[in-house]
Amino acid sequence: MKASQFFISTLKEAPADAEVVSHKLMTRAGLIKKLGAGIYNYMPMGLRVIRKVEAIVREEMNRAGAVEVTMPVVQPAEMWEETGRFEKMGPELLRIKDRHGRDFVIQPTSEEVVTDIARQELKSYKQLPKNFYQIQTKFRDERRPRFGLMRGREFIMKDAYSFDKDRDTAQISYQTMRAAYKRIFDRFGLQYRAVRADSGAIGGDLSEEFQVIASTGEDAIVYCPSSDYAANIEKAEALAPAGPRPAAAQAMARVATPGNSTCESVAGQLGLPLSQTVKSLVLATDKLDDKGDVAGSQVWLLLLRGDHEMNEIKVAKVPGLDVGFRFATVAEIEEHFGCQPGYLGPIGLKKPVKLVVDREVAVMADWVCGANEADFHITGVNFGRDLPEPDVVADLRNVVAGDKSPDGAGELAIERGIEVGHVFYLGTKYSQAMNATFLAENGKPSLFEMGCYGIGVTRLPAAAIEQNHDERGIIWPDAIAPFTVVVCPIGMDRSEPVKEAAEKLHAELLALGVDVILDDRGERPGAMFADWELIGVPHRVVLSDRGLKEGQVEYQHRRDTEATKMAAADVLGHLKQRLGL
């Protein structure tokens, strides 16, 4: 490819609405062009990256035995009504009507359509397992699209769906896809982690996210450097506290804490570590009558250490709270505690509540909590002496760096990541909702056991940039760079030797199957180099009249700060070695 034939459009400044590095650089490098909120044109340079991502994904999915299909972007609402998602998905699901007034949706995922294919086509256990995948445009009507391709409304995604005869074979399909994903992300050349994720109502541990490591990532990734334990912040656990609760050493006392309504300020006033304070969170569950109207509520008090934060996913698994909970209203709090939020605690309640305690609090002695009176707290509080043992003890909190890993291998660390893939065991959630069955070996109808597996094809280049960039621009890994090598001849239009040498090297690289571009635009050296550093092509060869007279060219990898001079006769061999050819 010659640059004069290609479309190159770079900008010196990023648009004002670009907040993150990837959005700024993708726009400046001419990879994408905004059309509307969360909607982008994939320009030629950007499309080359996307096609390389797709090619790797397609190769590994085929290698894993998955079969490619393409399902419609516009889907009949009837199938989504079968699963209940037509209403449950809320405004993120874009709904449209055709000229006849029939309802349709623009697909964000395709569980319904692929399950419909299975129930029509997969009649017998002899046809299983099957795994269908597509690389297709999706749409989610994000309330606030931002960060360019990181959180757009229209995007390209690879979604795959496995169908098995039972849970055991479904787990084999899951592990097959997990292994395929590891090969895919290894080939991308990115730093990533496969982390355990919450499985929601389905339960179990068969749910993992593939996170590209980046300091700008939205997700917190918890891992143990001494083992293979890794989980997202919602799923991560610390090692349960060991040993019995210490004996009480203090008498309970009511102390004035004027104006100090937070654990931090109370700890500061009393000269105590924050970990000796206990925060009170008040939740409520609603009781419904036969008509579905609220007929009453149950108030719950959660106790966590002052230096810990509540994990809503974990709280939602507590029996009684698993039906759905909300934060209590001020009126409910005053009714049960006789106090405004800020000084709440479990002692001296006006009305009884369900007491749920984090397991770290359950083994504390002589702790500090609110006195249920403005400007007062209680010190020296102990379970069994000053208040009854809790109704429930559970893991309710987010882990923090330095916690013990649950496998006992060391301490947990936390880093930021960008989710670009997810493998998930679905069970019979969709097959049951859509009555998708096959004839089992016993001759009876049986529900498909399903799994789903997604990769954000257009999100991945943005994540790669967040991980691989510098002040000059993008630094692409070889596997997904728009071009692997750029040949930069200086004064090509004025020097026949430079032109001949550049075209010869270009032709030799093409013959080897290298994705190479020859910059024949006639740009000044500074502008030419700045363009390719911004675009991020990994390997650059510079040819000049003076260098060729000395029998030399310059080679520079995009990560290098300076170019390396080498014999012109050696540069092809050097590139072959660097590219593994």
Swiss-Prot record:
Compartmental location: Cytoplasm
Physiological role: Catalyzes the attachment of proline to tRNA(Pro) in a two-step reaction: proline is first activated by ATP to form Pro-AMP and then transferred to the acceptor end of tRNA(Pro). As ProRS can inadvertently accommodate and process non-cognate amino acids such as alanine and cysteine, to avoid such errors it has two additional distinct editing activities against alanine. One activity is designated as 'pretransfer' editing and involves the tRNA(Pro)-independent hydrolysis of activated Ala-AMP.
Annotated GO CC locations: cytosol
GO biological process, one term: prolyl-tRNA aminoacylation
Domain of life according to the entry: Bacteria
Family: Belongs to the class-II aminoacyl-tRNA synthetase family. ProS type 1 subfamily.
Identification of the protein by name: Proline--tRNA ligase
Domain free text: Consists of three domains: the N-terminal catalytic domain, the editing domain and the C-terminal anticodon-binding domain.
Record-annotated disulphide pairs: none
Record keyword Acetylation present: no
Reactions the enzyme catalyzes: tRNA(Pro) + L-proline + ATP = L-prolyl-tRNA(Pro) + AMP + diphosphate
Alphabetized UniProt keyword annotations: Aminoacyl-tRNA synthetase, ATP-binding, Cytoplasm, Ligase, Nucleotide-binding, Protein biosynthesis
Species of the source: Delftia acidovorans (strain DSM 14801 / SPH-1)
Recorded name of the encoding gene: proS
NCBIfam families the UniProt entry points to: PRK09194.1 (NF006625), proS_fam_II (TIGR00409)
Gene3D superfamilies, A to Z: Anticodon-binding domain, Bira Bifunctional Protein, Domain 2, YbaK/aminoacyl-tRNA synthetase-associated domain
InterPro entries recorded: aa-tRNA-synt_IIb (IPR002314), aa-tRNA-synth_II (IPR006195), aa-tRNA-synth_II/BPL/LPL (IPR045864), Anticodon-bd (IPR004154), Anticodon-bd_dom_sf (IPR036621), Pro-tRNA-ligase_IIa (IPR002316), Pro-tRNA-synth_IIa_bac-type (IPR004500), Pro-tRNA-Synthase_IIa_type1 (IPR023717)
KW Membrane (keyword) present: no
Assembly information from the UniProt record: Homodimer.
